[in-house]
Amino acid sequence: MPFIPHTEDDVRLMLDTIGVESIDALFDEIPAELNTHPILESVPKPQSEAATLRLQSARAREGDGRLNFIGAGAYEHHIPAAVWELVTRGEFYSAYTPYQAEASQGILQTIYEFQSMMAGLMGMDLSNASLYDGATALAEAVLMAVRANPAPRGSTPRVIMPATVHPAYREVVQTMVRHQGIELVEPSFCAKRGGVAVSALNLYADEPVQALVIAQPNFFGQLEDVDFLTNWAHKRGALVIGVVNPVAMALLKPPAAWGEKGADIACGEGQPLGVPLSFGGPYLGFLSCRQALARQMPGRIVGRTLDQEGKEGFVLTLQAREQHIRRAKATSNICTNQGLLSIAATIHMAMLGPEGLKNVALTCHRRTQQLWQRLALLEGVERCFEGPFFHEVAIKLSKPAEEVLTCLSGVNIAGGYAVGRRYPGMENVLLVCCTETKERSDLDHYADALGLIMSEQGSAA
């Protein structure tokens, strides 16, 4: 946005008025070691608008034609052109929070439809109007579960979050609960199946537990034994939180049908539903639950009602939020949601329909199966884990994954995610994702390129 910068005289006048010697003095509470952090020195100097445009255009061209096989929480799907053509209409794009219900019926109804679709996809009774992203949705689900299922007096609330849950999600949850007296425990995964290790889980069999988090599919792309895990948790009085891929739920058993009683809360990342990758955001989180937990649900909820004349209307309801009640009594201190992106997800799901979304999920799975069948024939490549997967597969290489990715990048292929970045000891493991955006020729190209790299002697580099 064009602006006229402050002159030196303007700055001096403002500093003198507030009694401060210099601009740096305004920030003297920041420790010196943070002000001289190496990452700050790497930030480039300001550039003109024209120079910035040239730089960004050049970087955009670098990505042209690159085949993307990276997943690990953010997935490349085809988005019908009509989705963002509609989302960017002024009525959606620039509208603010619909506090005034009588003037916001269109947006309120659209959000209500989002809630209905997500609740239906999860098999749950209700959904909220979205949260920031999948990680914060899981964090809110954990807080929600601890409120609904408090620990015995005198004991610390405990939530089991296995190592198969996305590591970034675990970090965010840890950040949000660290100072709220909640203990997070992370049982390890089974080296054979890539799912939650039952032996590690049973270490807490006789301990009070408030909730168990189950990722489906998990970070490695593997499908967990959700029925066993759900029954294990409920038998011990713990609530079950499912953190799931919404596209996968069109094909797999929904959280509400897990085990004998079903999961209590379902959450996850809604980015696969019509939201571009966009360098990691903005995305949207979703959160749904059973009716019994409705009062613990954070975030906005749109309800449908009748006015005094009997006409249908939509309103914000159950607003137990920090901007409406005392902060200490609020269910959440996240004071906004991703309304625009939830509208995109609504339009995307409406355009695909139940069968269309199921076909997308099925195509993703088939493409990944086909890719693995090709990769299985290569020298120095094997499955890291046994058992079923959805649209990501972890493969073990005879060379370091980072080096292999560098070589693949040289032939314009984003080859996957190096698992060793997050899991020490798995430096040779590559997580490869394949969605409906890939054709058979793309799979062949990837397999041929990887095969050539793996057949070379010595280092992949």
From Swiss-Prot:
<dbReference type="GO" id="GO:0004375">
    <property type="term" value="F:glycine dehydrogenase (decarboxylating) activity"/>
</dbReference>
<dbReference type="GO" id="GO:0019464">
    <property type="term" value="P:glycine decarboxylation via glycine cleavage system"/>
</dbReference>
<dbReference type="InterPro" id="IPR015424">
    <property type="entry name" value="PyrdxlP-dep_Trfase"/>
</dbReference>
<dbReference type="GO" id="GO:0009116">
    <property type="term" value="P:nucleoside metabolic process"/>
</dbReference>
<comment type="subunit">
    <text>The glycine cleavage system is composed of four proteins: P, T, L and H. In this organism, the P 'protein' is a heterodimer of two subunits.</text>
</comment>
<dbReference type="Pfam" id="PF02347">
    <property type="entry name" value="GDC-P"/>
</dbReference>
<dbReference type="InterPro" id="IPR049315">
    <property type="entry name" value="GDC-P_N"/>
</dbReference>
<keyword id="KW-0560">Oxidoreductase</keyword>
<comment type="similarity">
    <text>Belongs to the GcvP family. N-terminal subunit subfamily.</text>
</comment>
<comment type="function">
    <text>The glycine cleavage system catalyzes the degradation of glycine. The P protein binds the alpha-amino group of glycine through its pyridoxal phosphate cofactor; CO(2) is released and the remaining methylamine moiety is then transferred to the lipoamide cofactor of the H protein.</text>
</comment>
<dbReference type="InterPro" id="IPR023010">
    <property type="entry name" value="GcvPA"/>
</dbReference>
<protein>
    <recommendedName>
        <fullName>Probable glycine dehydrogenase (decarboxylating) subunit 1</fullName>
        <ecNumber>1.4.4.2</ecNumber>
    </recommendedName>
</protein>
<dbReference type="InterPro" id="IPR020581">
    <property type="entry name" value="GDC_P"/>
</dbReference>
<dbReference type="InterPro" id="IPR015422">
    <property type="entry name" value="PyrdxlP-dep_Trfase_small"/>
</dbReference>
<dbReference type="InterPro" id="IPR015421">
    <property type="entry name" value="PyrdxlP-dep_Trfase_major"/>
</dbReference>
